[in-house]
Amino acid sequence: MSTITITPISTFRTDDPYPFCPGCGHGPILDRLNEAMTRLDLDPANVVIVSDIGCSGLSDQYFTTSAFHGLHGRSITYATGIKLANPDLEVIVIMGDGGTGIGGAHLLSAARRNIGITVIVMNNLNFGMTGGQHSTTTPEGGVTSTTPHGNLEHPLDICATVGVNGAAYVYRGSSFDKDLADRFVAAMSTPGFALLDVWDLCTAYYVRSNKFTRAGMEESMRSWGMEPGLLYERNVTEYATGYRAAHASIAGSSVAGARPVPVDYAHTLARPMSLVVAG
């Protein structure tokens, strides 16, 4: 009998170079993600990377996994549906601080449900792709193209927000963390909602406007009351698992068929018509 030898995958990356600006932290973050997936010996066919809009939204095309690219701020909703439909998939969301703010309600719901997805927030404190506008994580006093005299809004603490709402694993760090791949491994190994708020430098805009540096970023975390490190780790029931257990008694049963729509009015149209609703 012949023996089949399976060679472990050495990388999940394609051969294409990243499109990010020189000094941008997005590339190192993706490299650490690639390292983590390789160490976990995942099957690319069972991994789905979900992204939306912005510089972070370019990420999924540089991996050999399945991917879903959708609307700004909605990546968590897509990921939730994918995980509920097939709980055996490893579902990873890559989003920016812009998408996090736009999809804030989705973020809260995913944390409350403790749905088993891993969310990586590439947090560079502004909307980098569209010209450096301020986002929900831009610090007070931060200079951006939309806050030229300094941001007046208090920044969103992403980790505290999901932490108090039930997330199973919450970590804050930066693209410079030596153990970032370890953190990704731990997050993806957590049977529940895991979020990593990974700060990085937007060298095109925020760095230039604020003279922001690596040392300044790490000091800012503490001075702004946003301590780095593992902030929450809980052993709670994952939503997709709990949902199936709660509905086990009706699993496989048929659902109601489509109901006919009664015709109340006749039409006088002689040809097909199209209607566009915009809003």
Regions found by a protein language model. Give the residues of each.
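Conserved thiamine diphosphate
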Residues: 8-11, 88, 135-189
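Thiamine diphosphate
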Residues: 1-128, 181-182, 271-279
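Short coil/turn connectors at secondary-structure junctions
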Residues: 16, 43-47, 86-91, 112-118, ...
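Short catalytic-loop micro-motif centered on adjacent basic/acidic residues
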Residues: 20-22, 93-95, 169-174, 195
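Conserved active-site and cofactor/substrate-binding residues in soluble primary-metabolism enzymes
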Residues: 25-32, 44, 73, 77, ...
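Active-site-proximal loop->helix
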Residues: 105-111, 129-141, 161
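Flexible, low-complexity linker and terminal segments
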Residues: 1-6, 10, 15-19, 199-279
